[in-house]
């Protein structure tokens, strides 16, 4: 195959900004704006420190609409910049955690991940996303993404290779390309290969398979018709021995079958209604988001919140082979995540965004980390990992059942944890697609009033109100304006944040976190006073016109 380098002038395209984890835009905007992807990909190569000299790069994605077009452009821009060692997942597939593992195992300089994560997909109403990962396997830090944004704002020229025939990436193998005298190879790989090898280092699959067989474990796994479908069959059916009937929505589709791939109680209702009832035939259920880095865990009679999952994993790490082999060095959580894990062990508190865990993991300070937004992961890779979290829970069930010599369920483990450590009642309100200026004005009003605001929580006085600022203990960097916190004398917290993962308008997230030793109370009643206070101090209805949230988690 032959390639010729072309250069042509361009102009900046407004709105090419990076949120919590990369670019997120409506697919229709990306598709209908001339040079949208060519501009942005060139900006990435112009600005990112790990793309300034040719090295090995990995490209993959969650299978959503426009991914194949983006993949083609990334390859051709890479060729034009002298990159000769390009690795892509077959048919463009590679989950985010799998790509992190592949970057690490193949010692790549960078990874391009085509995903809008838990956002819907499709031509008309779906989103497209693209993010850059570094050589450690983790998301690009703020100093890199800021330079990419600056490059996109000032771009004047597109540099790209033109191929003499289309690339075929639907078969594993090497594609040799000669680009103006330089030979390059596009390696099309099995997107499962490196990730499954990594999972074998983390878990004892023979033991888990015996456990599944011994107790006839009934499991349901929802892949939302996204990329984890290709991984779920291998992991849950081949390695654990579960029947294929355990898998739901397991065939990846460009529009995810019209599903919203956010693994929470609202969008994973099919799984929730099948597994949570007390008379359910299922022992445990899992759902994973579009790119496979988020997880929902439910059991018969039980929903395991991400915050509780992190806390329980922190107490049961000896049941997880990865930690037995590598040691357990510490835990980090994002600031809005409930303080459940704080009652178990000392923690490091970071802003929202998996990239903030990277320095802590690279420096050996932590082994486990998690976010309230259904993300859990370990230092084995540098992304959160839905399937890894699910296998941790299967490992815990296996260990507890072995000790009890009977099948121990999710609900029993959850309630046993609460009985020992107490319970953090927790809820999140999402106000989606609100006017961006109104949302920003609301946040600024609370910042301005932080030192003078007066409120109490059913008689419990406010301890302080601030705008969370993170000081990285590894590199000394400071990240400000990460969420308005109302912290009360009993430790209860109300938190306001603007999300960085939406594609239209702004999303306001409001978090409620209250600790109690009584773990059997009604959550809605426990948090009712907090909701009233939140509406009052934020004036959210006045600013947004919304009386109710779009989603409650």
Curated annotation (Swiss-Prot):
Superkingdom assignment: Eukaryota
Keyword Phosphoprotein: yes
Subcellular location per the Swiss-Prot or TrEMBL entry: Cytoplasm
UniProt-annotated stretches for the region Disordered: 1-25
UniProt KW keywords: Cytoplasm, Isomerase, Magnesium, Metal-binding, Phosphoprotein
Single GO BP term: carbohydrate metabolic process
Function in brief: Catalyzes the reversible conversion of glucose 1-phosphate into glucose 6-phosphate. This enzyme participates in both the breakdown and synthesis of glucose.
NCBIfam families: PRK07564.1-1
Full protein name: Phosphoglucomutase
Organism encoding this protein: Entamoeba histolytica (strain ATCC 30459 / HM-1:IMSS / ABRM)
Organism classification: Eukaryota, Amoebozoa, Evosea, Archamoebae, Mastigamoebida
């Amino acid at each position: 195959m032959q390639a010729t380098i072309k250069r042509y002038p361009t102009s900046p395209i407004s709105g090419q900004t990076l949120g919590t984890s990369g670019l997120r835009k409506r697919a229709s905007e990306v598709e209908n704006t001339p040079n949208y992807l060519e501009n942005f990909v060139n900006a990435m190569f112009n600005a990112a420190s790990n793309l300034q000299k040719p090295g090995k790069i990995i490209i993959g994605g969650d299978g959503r609409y426009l991914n194949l077009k983006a993949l083609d452009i990334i390859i051709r821009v890479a060729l034009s910049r002298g990159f000769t060692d390009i690795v892509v997942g077959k048919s463009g597939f590679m989950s985010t955690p799998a790509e992190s593992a592949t970057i690490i195992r193949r010692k790549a300089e960078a990874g391009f991940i085509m995903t809008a994560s838990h956002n819907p997909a499709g031509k008309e109403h779906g989103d497209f996303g693209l993010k850059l990962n570094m050589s450690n396997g983790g998301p690009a830090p703020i100093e890199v993404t800021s330079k990419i944004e600056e490059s996109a704002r000032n771009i004047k020229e597109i540099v790209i290779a033109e191929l003499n025939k289309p690339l075929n990436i639907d078969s594993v193998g090497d594609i040799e390309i000669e680009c103006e005298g330089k030979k390059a190879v596009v390696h099309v790989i099995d997107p499962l290969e490196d990730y499954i090898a990594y999972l074998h280092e983390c878990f004892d699959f023979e033991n888990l398979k015996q456990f599944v067989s011994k107790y006839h474990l009934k499991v349901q796994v929802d892949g939302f018709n996204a990329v984890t479908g290709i991984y779920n069959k291998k992991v849950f059916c081949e390695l654990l021995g579960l029947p294929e009937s355990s898998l739901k929505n397991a065939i990846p589709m460009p529009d995810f079958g019209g599903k919203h791939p956010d693994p929470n109680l609202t969008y994973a209702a099919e799984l929730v209604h099948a597994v949570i009832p007390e008379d359910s035939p299922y022992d445990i259920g899992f759902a994973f988001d579009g790119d496979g880095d988020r997880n929902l865990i439910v059991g018969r009679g039980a929903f395991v919140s991400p915050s509780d999952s992190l806390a329980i994993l922190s107490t049961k790490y000896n049941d997880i082979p990865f930690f037995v082999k590598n040691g357990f060095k510490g835990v980090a959580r994002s600031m809005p995540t409930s303080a459940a894990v704080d009652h178990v062990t000392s923690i490091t508190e970071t802003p929202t965004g998996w990239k903030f865990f990277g320095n802590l993991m690279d420096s050996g300070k932590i082994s486990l980390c998690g976010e309230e937004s259904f993300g859990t992961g370990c230092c084995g890779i540098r992304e959160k990992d839905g399937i890894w979290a699910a296998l941790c829970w299967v490992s815990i069930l296996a260990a507890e059942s072995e000790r009890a010599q009977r099948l121990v369920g999710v609900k029993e483990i959850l309630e046993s944890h609460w009985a020992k450590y107490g319970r953090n009642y927790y809820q999140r309100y999402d106000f989606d697609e609100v006017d961006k200026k109104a949302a920003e004005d609301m946040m600024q009003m609370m910042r301005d009033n932080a030192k003078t605001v007066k409120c109490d929580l059913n008689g419990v006085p406010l301890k302080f109100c601030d705008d969370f600022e993170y000081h990285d203990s590894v590199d000394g960097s400071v990240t400000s304006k990460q969420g308005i916190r109302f912290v009360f004398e009993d430790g209860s917290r109300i938190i306001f944040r603007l999300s960085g993962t939406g594609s239209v308008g702004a999303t306001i997230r409001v978090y409620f976190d209250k600790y109690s030793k009584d773990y059997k109370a009604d959550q809605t009643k426990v948090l009712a006073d907090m909701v009233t206070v939140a509406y009052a101090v934020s004036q959210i209805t006045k600013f947004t016109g919304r009386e109710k949230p779009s989603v409650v988690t």
